[in-house]
């Protein structure tokens, strides 16, 4: 199993990141911590950066009239943060990511929500 540190000298250790191929076990779920709380600034910058200026993401009055009642965090921002959370654990040692088979967002994300991620090993190739 993956160790968090490696010895680099007498009484000297260095933090390590990532997993090697043999460290992945089909069916295992890896939790990614720490969490990340989404701010209004995060959401505003991301909507502007990606040119996704739908008012549901930043217009409070518009959002009040929707089923959500308040602005939604832009979904690609949610994905980007969760992917970033996983890097040090599951892909730090990878040469290339093979891709994602399934991404689910079962609930809306709002400003002030804290995200936690997890990855499940479905197969190895």
Positions of predicted regions on the chain:
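Hydrophobic beta-sheet segments that form the core/acyl-binding groove
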Residues: 100-125
